[in-house]
């Protein structure tokens, strides 16, 4: 029950944060984009947010986690039907400075998964573990080997000459 309430509260904070971002971009005069890069697509929240608020020719969304990417893949037809005038491309890669295999720490609460090192002794980590684990015997995260690519190589390979907006969740 604590996990459920915690996630609901986090979703409320996300909603208001997203609304602030959209208001800021509209205030700055942004109404349309040719190309948006969405690094850290998660389950498509940013795809929906940007395509609901802007005219976008193409959005390239990257999600590193194979587990979360499967969820995103299940939603892609919905997004493509909802936003027919936009091209939506999803990729199952991490973005980094070097092309290499890296270890992803896949957390139970998937929006916090990371390729960075986790400090399991930090107060933040301990609080997160307390609030988000239903059963203290459950895993909190597991490591999965994934592919990291260089963004510049991806842009060249896919003939993308300009990027109007880059959204990064790290």
Question: Can you name each region flagged by the protein language model?
Answer:
Residues 1-170:
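Phosphate/nucleotide-binding beta-alpha loop and adjacent structural elements of enzyme active sites
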């Amino acid at each position: 029950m604590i996990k459920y309430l915690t996630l609901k509260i986090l979703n409320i904070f996300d909603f208001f944060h997203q609304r602030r971002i959209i208001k800021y971009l509209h205030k700055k005069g942004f109404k349309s984009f040719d190309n948006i890069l969405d690094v850290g697509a998660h389950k498509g929240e940013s795809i929906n947010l940007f395509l609901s608020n802007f005219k976008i020719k193409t959005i390239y969304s990257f999600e590193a986690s194979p587990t979360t990417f499967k969820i995103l893949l299940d939603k892609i037809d919905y997004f493509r039907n909802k936003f027919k005038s936009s091209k939506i491309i999803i990729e199952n890669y991490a973005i980094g400075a070097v092309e290499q295999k890296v270890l992803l720490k896949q957390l139970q609460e998937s929006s916090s998964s990371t390729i960075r090192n986790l400090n399991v002794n930090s107060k933040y980590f301990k609080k997160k573990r307390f609030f988000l684990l239903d059963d203290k015997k459950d895993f909190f995260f597991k490591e999965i080997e994934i592919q990291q690519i260089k963004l510049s190589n991806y842009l060249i390979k896919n003939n993308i000459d300009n990027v109007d907006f880059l959204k990064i969740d790290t």
